[in-house]
Amino acid sequence: MALSCSTVRPRRRGSALRSKMELLSRAEQEMSLAALKQHDPYITSIADLTGQVALYTFCPKANQWEKTDIEGTLFVYRRSASPYHGFTIVNRLNMHNLVEPVNKDLEFQLHEPFLLYRNASLSIYSIWFYDKNDCHRIAKLMADVVEEETRRSQQAARDKQSPSQANGCSDQRPIDILEMLSRAKDEYERNQMGGSNISSPGLQPSTQLSNLGSTETLEETPSGSQDKSAPSGHKHLTVEELFGTSLPKEQPTAMGLESEDTDKLLGDASQKEPSSFLPFPFEQSGGAPQSENLGIHSAAHHTVQPEVSTPVLITPASIAQSGDKHPPSYTLPLSPVLSPTLPAEAPTTQVPHLPRNSTMIQAVKTTPRQKSPLLNQPVPELSHSSLVASQSPFRAPVSLANPAGTALPSVDLLQKLRLTPQHDQIQAQPLGKGTMAPSFSSAAGQLATPESFIEPSSKTAAARAAVSASLSNMVLAPTLQSMQQNQDPEVFSQPKVLPSAIPIAGSPLVPATTTAVSSVLLSPSVFQQTVPRAADLERKASSPSPLTVGTAESQRKPSIILSKSQLQDTLIHLIKNDSSFLSTLHAVYLQVLTKNKDNHNL
């Protein structure tokens, strides 16, 4: 009995020592855990530790190992956030510790007493262990942790590709705004394609082709309804893919891709990783620019595309075919700039090689098939004076494009617009340029060109003299008559000049010597200047003034306000060449002097 009692007492002492050591080790672990949490608050527990390790690094240039200044205790810990595992070496030599997260990209190799590993940045390190048992234990733990992280990443990838619940919603997964926008975009495109299938049957092949992506997605996902798994193929949209293209599901038809090629592209895209998966893989493989989404297709692709109800721009090939046809006959002649029958004047020649996105050249090519804006309306029925104007060398449209379809100018305006050399009616022109209407054929109307405004220098003096002589009865005769009636010395003061009443850019009805087109295009300034003049003529005709002298022809003409230089030239010419004018002027001068003398005497 004594022997048995002596053998029991040491056992009790050993168990008490082990429990005491466990309490001490637990307290040390708690202290170590608190110290680690100061550096990383997401650490939850310590998985394993070893007392003495040293870190070596491999130098590829020297092809040898180099010892670092990191040496101390190794801790393997667990974290509550990603990455969920890691290890650190608490350095005893300095304040720089080694912290390495453990993920699926970490590779370990055991070479006793060293544990080699390579991280994601392709740096190679070696951990030397003082105890070989610790080296084997830590190596086995690291292998288990890497395997666990690999399974975790694969599960996260599967959860990202397909919903984790039956109703298509996952509470653990965060809400993705791009995924919500892509689902709304897919639903909108399905509604648009459904409406277009009813309106135009030509879009049915492209609709079937665009639905291949959703069909292959259904084959890879688990069993479920079509509505649950259809949006899963478009979860990895980017902002550029979502807002950068317009109607991308109609791309296969515009680019001329076959259905087999599209199936192959979609099959390759479905086997890739989720990060490289593209919802629209055929956009990059076609090699066509994004400008084809706007309807600017090439001529070769234009023949492959089926009939679509949406409007597209006319290609150069279609314009070349339509240009061979005869131009339609119109009641009014076209402008020479827009007329297809004048190849020398029309700058719309066919260019053999055009850029694909040159919309401006294509727009210019379509202009020969349009009417001139000024000749768009039919000529209204006018009175007898308009019939006479149609026989004159200047035929100008007098009607504007108004909703009522009536002619705005009156008959007097029509008479003012036409120019008849038989009655010697001269319109108001700037005397500084001295431009006169040259002789022209009376067979057809002429079109005013820039060359008609250039007058030879030899005709300038004669034209100026003729105009000043003809204007003397119109302007100076009423002035002299008013001086004789009023006997006012202020008559000789300089008259007010209104530069806006005299056209500076030349008369709008100057003819040219061309016989290509039998119509005259008028600028908008003609209607702005002639309408108030016609109103002044009607007002003057209704109220005759006793101050007007001369013939009946001069009474019908409006008074023209001359500038200082024009008045000076006219007066000098009349004083030198007209003796009656000089006599009348001298008589008025004597009367004014007599009146001033009488007023001074009174």
Curated annotation (Swiss-Prot):
The modification Asymmetric dimethylarginine is found at residue 395. GO terms for cellular component: cytoplasm; dendrite; nucleus; P-body; transcription regulator complex. Ubiquitous, with highest expression in the spleen and testis (at protein level). Disruption phenotype: Embryonic lethality around embryonic day 10.5 concomitant with massive growth retardation and cardiac developmental defects seen. Keywords: Cytoplasm, Hydrolase, Methylation, Nonsense-mediated mRNA decay, Nucleus, Phosphoprotein. It catalyses: a 5'-end (N(7)-methyl 5'-triphosphoguanosine)-ribonucleoside in mRNA + H2O = N(7)-methyl-GDP + a 5'-end phospho-ribonucleoside in mRNA + 2 H(+). Residues 152-174, 191-234, 267-291 are annotated as: Disordered. One of its GO terms (biological process) is nuclear-transcribed mRNA catabolic process, nonsense-mediated decay. Pfam families: DCP1, mRNA_decap_C. GO terms for molecular function: 5'-(N(7)-methylguanosine 5'-triphospho)-[mRNA] hydrolase activity; enzyme activator activity; identical protein binding; kinesin binding. The modification Phosphothreonine is found at residues 367, 420, 548, 551. InterPro entries: Dcp1 (IPR010334), mRNA_decap_C (IPR031953), PH-like_dom_sf (IPR011993). Residues 193-229 have a biased composition (Polar residues). It is found in: Cytoplasm, P-body; Nucleus. Its EC number is 3.6.1.62. Residues 152-161 have a biased composition (Basic and acidic residues). The modification Phosphoserine is found at residues 82, 162, 199-200, 335, 339, 372, 441, 542-543, 545. Forms a complex with EDC3, DCP2, DDX6 and EDC4/HEDLS, within this complex directly interacts with EDC3. Part of a cytoplasmic complex containing proteins involved in mRNA decay, including XRN1 and LSM1. Interacts with DCP1B. Interacts with DCP2. Interacts with DDX17 in an RNA-independent manner. Interacts with PNRC2. Interacts with SMAD4. Interacts with UPF1. Interacts with ZC3HAV1. Interacts with ZFP36L1. Interacts with NBDY. Interacts with DHX34; the interaction is RNA-independent. Belongs to the DCP1 family. Necessary for the degradation of mRNAs, both in normal mRNA turnover and in nonsense-mediated mRNA decay. Removes the 7-methyl guanine cap structure from mRNA molecules, yielding a 5'-phosphorylated mRNA fragment and 7m-GDP. Contributes to the transactivation of target genes after stimulation by TGFB1. Essential for embryonic development. This is mRNA-decapping enzyme 1A. It comes from Mus musculus.
